[in-house]
Swiss-Prot record:
It comes from the Bacteria. It comes from Yersinia enterocolitica serotype O:8 / biotype 1B (strain NCTC 13174 / 8081). Its EC number is 3.5.2.9. Gene3D superfamilies: Glycoside hydrolase/deacetylase. It catalyses: 5-oxo-L-proline + ATP + 2 H2O = L-glutamate + ADP + phosphate + H(+). InterPro entries: Glyco_hydro/deAcase_b/a-brl, LamB/YcsF/PxpA-like. Catalyzes the cleavage of 5-oxoproline to form L-glutamate coupled to the hydrolysis of ATP to ADP and inorganic phosphate. This is 5-oxoprolinase subunit A. GO terms for molecular function: 5-oxoprolinase (ATP-hydrolyzing) activity; ATP binding.
C-alpha cells in the first residue's frame, strides 16, 4: 500500500526544512496569502535537495487573513489569478532545475472550490492551461476533484490527519471549536482508517467513505514535526510506503 504525505510550505514557518525530510510532496505558497519570490526559491531548492515533489499552493488574494477570507469572485478572475500564481512558481522551479508536479489550492479557495462547481472548473481550467500534466489535489470526493476529472487532469484526493469531518465529507470549519483534532493518538487512528479502510468517522459518529491518495500534515510548531514523525513511523509499521504519486 502506498500513500503520499504532503505539507504546505513557504508560509513563514520555521520548520519547513525539517518537514521536507518527512513528507513526499510540498505545496509552496505563491505570494497571494503568504510567501514571496525569495521564499518560493528557497522552498524549491530544499524540495529538490530532499527529493520531494514540488507543487503550487495558490490562494485568493488575502495576505491580511492568510487566505482564509471567503470571497465571491467571478470565475474568470479566479482563473487569471491561479494562472498568475502557477506561472510565478513554475518559472522559479524551472530556473532551479526542478519540475512542478501538482497544484493544491489554499485555504478558503480550497474550501469554496470543494463545494462550488463553477469555481472548481475555473481552477481546473487554469491548471490545464498552464500544464495539462499537472496533478490537481483537492478534498476527497469534492467538486474540485470532479472538475479536475472533467478537465482531463490527473487528480489526487486529499485527506487531513488533524481535521474533523462532517457527515457530508467536508471539513468542520476552522471557526468551530472542534475543527482540529488535538490528540495525536486520535489523529493517527483517523489517518490509518482513511488510508487503510477508506472511511472516516464524522463528528456525528457516522462513518463516511473517503479516498485517501494524499494526507496533509501541518508544519507549524515543534509539535507538528513530532506528529509527522509519528505518522511516518505508523505507516512504516503498517507497511504503508510514503511516496509522491
Amino acid at each position: 500500500m502506498k500513500v503520499d504525505l504532503n505539507a504546505d510550505l513557504g508560509e513563514g514557518c520555521a520548520n519547513d526544512q525539517a518537514l521536507l525530510q518527512l513528507v513526499s510532496s510540498a505545496n509552496i505558497a505563491c505570494g497571494f496569502h503568504a510567501g514571496d519570490a525569495q521564499t518560493m526559491r528557497q522552498s524549491v531548492r530544499w524540495a529538490i535537495e530532499y527529493g520531494v515533489a514540488i507543487g503550487a499552493h495558490p490562494s485568493f488574494p488575502d495576505r491580511e487573513n492568510f487566505g482564509r477570507t471567503a470571497m465571491q469572485l467571478p470565475p474568470e478572475t479566479v482563473y487569471a489569478q491561479v494562472v498568475y500564481q502557477l506561472g510565478a512558481l513554475a518559472a522559479i522551479v524551472k530556473a532551479e532545475g526542478g519540475i512542478m508536479q501538482h497544484v493544491k489550492p489554499h485555504g478558503m479557495l480550497y474550501n469554496q472550490a470543494a463545494l462550488d462547481p463553477l469555481l472548481a472548473d475555473a481552477i481546473a481550467q487554469a491548471v490545464k492551461a498552464v500544464d495539462p500534466i499537472l496533478r490537481l489535489v483537492g478534498l476527497a470526493g469534492s467538486e474540485l476533484i470532479r472538475a479536475g476529472e472533467r478537465a482531463g487532469l490527473v487528480t489526487r484526493q486529499e485527506v487531513f490527519a488533524d481535521r474533523r469531518y462532517q457527515s457530508d465529507g467536508t471539513l468542520v470549519p476552522r471557526s468551530q471549536p472542534d475543527a482540529l483534532i488535538e490528540s495525536d493518538d486520535l489523529a493517527l487512528s483517523q489517518t490509518l482508517a482513511m488510508v487503510q479502510r477508506h472511511q472516516v468517522q464524522a463528528r456525528d459518529g457516522s462513518w463516511v467513505p473517503v479516498q485517501a491518495d494524499t494526507v496533509c500534515v501541518h508544519g507549524d510548531g515543534a509539535h507538528a514535526l513530532n506528529f509527522a514523525r509519528r505518522l511516518r513511523d505508523s505507516f512504516q509499521q503498517e507497511n504503508i510506503t510514503v511516496t509522491a504519486q
